[in-house]
């Protein structure tokens, strides 16, 4: 019985990957100008600005990560900071290290493009660590944040069970996640419970898990304004890095939506990372700015699909049209459904264009 189910699952997985490959085969991807080995990026941060839900984004990131890690030795690590909750990065890291398949079997089961992306990262077999500290739970709205949050506390329940701790409190909390919905007082009460369990805890596995859970519960639980989210992300990222994540000797990549990367917005994440006195990346941020020319953006971030005509770096600002005209003046895309990396040689008085290493040009992507 189990063998039959496993064979069926394997065949369905192959069919899924074949379907994705067929859908992506029409894409033209040109990354020959991306030469990370020549850019002295170790200890710096390559900040990638994106507009969400464009099909070539995943082809881009797969190519970029493959090139960055191509000559890695066993002592090298790539840190990838995502616009995502900690609980999602927790399961991403488990999957790419071969520990379990919760990421693709549950959290991303309806998103074949992301499944293919993480499958390709796993196949690289390199030291890659995903780091994410954005808001969690999202008030129970359907999607990856809700799913990863729910599964994270199911995992905590199993850890508590292995330590013979009464499960009534955590079962009630999980019920609230799944069915009832959680209020601010629920988070506060459960966080106090976790802190109480941590006192004088001698089991190192349980102690570390409780500490991690406390960090998860301290996150924003709703989609706040970008400046509120960015401040929280920056502070929580600092907390993780101070706990022992090395960046100075490693390569560091950050992939974030354009609203968080505008150099003219002093409250955005990019500005904090490159200019704040307490930033570990102060004056060490390089920009990889994505450009979208007549590209379709799907799904979850928009009420409906929209066509993008923008440079992600200045999206939504008055500078966007100026930088888009500059890009098109210097580079004329010809192949539809294409992505091309172009090394920045453009001259402009717009802020921080001189910090752009690469333009990632997406052209007529459907």
What function would you assign to each model-found segment?
Residues 1-34:
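Bacterial Sec-dependent N-terminal signal peptides
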Residues 24-366:
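Compositional signal for N-terminal targeting/processing segments
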